[in-house]
Swiss-Prot record:
Protein name: Uncharacterized protein MG302
Family statement: Belongs to the CbiQ family.
Keywords, ordered alphabetically: Cell membrane, Membrane, Transmembrane, Transmembrane helix
Membrane topology: Multi-pass membrane protein
TM annotation in the entry: 18-38, 58-78, 92-112, 130-150, 159-179, 202-222, 252-272
PANTHER family in the cross-refs: PROTEIN ABCI12, CHLOROPLASTIC
Subcellular location: Cell membrane
Length: 317
């Protein structure tokens, strides 16, 4: 990430809080439109902070992979069980596996349909949101800043005489593990190229090339993270250490705007989608409304979409 990015100027503790909130919000009923909007915002932040589109395209490629995988899993159609109602027969492979297959007539065929696609799309959007939030946190914060943020986050544990510094070092190393592995892969590939080993897109089919790349990467990553952990423990980020070379960032207007805009966006999407869930036509409700089933003031006319919003919004079962 570019050092001049505005995300580098935001307090690391605030970014850690925002990452945790994103993890929770990803599994709340944001709705399909809400997840699309959040992903667009996160991908835009990735492009702005990186000043290139490559990182956003990598995240999108992973989202497409999970979309393809979930479409395959959710596309199986079940033989109808005449002993059950029509609604109970509208289930997918996940429900079939969880129930042990006892409540359904069995798997009949695979079909690409709107309901399976929407269910898979929601899961892929949630995964993409988590990837984007983690990418923004790890690339905009140094390992020192992450360790300091984690220690401040778990500061209350000191009341129970629990040492927070080892926990903060461990979590900081875990947060920076993927960027470390990425940099080590690039370094090892360049070193191996001088010895005549050229890696291309088909190299993963060659077991010998895989071993010559990933074994050195694994050993180098373990050694580097161990060295980093020792360095943090010896000097690093301890606020009481007079020999420290780093200082925590101070809160400023940018921090406040970043937190306020993020919380406001999450709140608006949650309220809008839950408003839609409450005001849909349900025979069990004693209230009647003139405008039911609207998302952002637009009515749902498709029965498949309506069923999806009402019953399978969480899309984790």
């Amino acid at each position: 990430m570019q050092k001049t990015s505005f995300l580098n100027k935001i307090d690391p503790l605030l970014k850690l809080w925002f990452w945790l909130i994103s993890l929770v919000v990803a599994f709340l009923p944001l709705g399909l439109y809400g997840l699309v909007i959040i992903n667009l915002v996160f991908l835009t932040l990735v492009v702005i902070s990186e000043k290139r589109v490559k990182s956003a395209l990598i995240i999108l490629s992973w989202m497409l992979f999970f979309l393809w995988f979930n479409v395959i899993v959710n596309g199986f159609i079940f033989l109808p069980n005449t002993a059950l109602s029509v609604d109970q027969n509208h289930n997918f492979l996940g429900s079939f596996i969880y129930s042990g297959g006892n409540n359904f007539g069995g798997v009949s065929w695979w079909s690409f349909n709107l309901r399976s696609f929407l269910r898979s799309f929601v899961i892929a959007l949630r995964i993409s949101m988590l990837f984007s939030a983690s990418f923004l946190l790890t690339t905009s914060s140094s390992i020192y800043e992450l360790a300091w943020a984690v220690e401040r986050f778990f500061k209350f544990l000191k009341l129970f005489h629990i040492k927070v510094q080892p926990i903060s070092i461990l979590l900081a190393v875990i947060f920076k593990l993927l960027p470390t592995v990425k940099s080590e892969i690039i370094r090892i590939k360049q070193a191996q190229a001088t010895r005549g080993f050229i890696y291309n897109k088909c190299s993963f089919l060659n077991p010998f090339k895989i071993k010559t790349l990933f074994i050195p990467v694994l050993l180098s990553t373990v050694k580097k993270t161990e060295t980093t952990a020792f360095a943090l423990q010896a000097k690093g980020y301890d606020l009481n250490n007079t020999n420290r070379t780093h200082y925590p960032l101070k809160y400023n207007l940018l921090n406040g705007v970043f937190l306020l805009v993020g919380l406001l966006l999450f709140s608006i999407l949650l309220i809008a989608n839950n408003w839609n869930l409450v005001y849909w036509e349900n025979p069990n409700y004693s209230f009647n409304f003139d405008k039911q089933n609207f998302i952002f003031l637009r009515a749902i006319n498709s029965n498949n979409l309506l069923y999806f919003w009402q019953i399978e919004l969480i899309a984790i079962g």
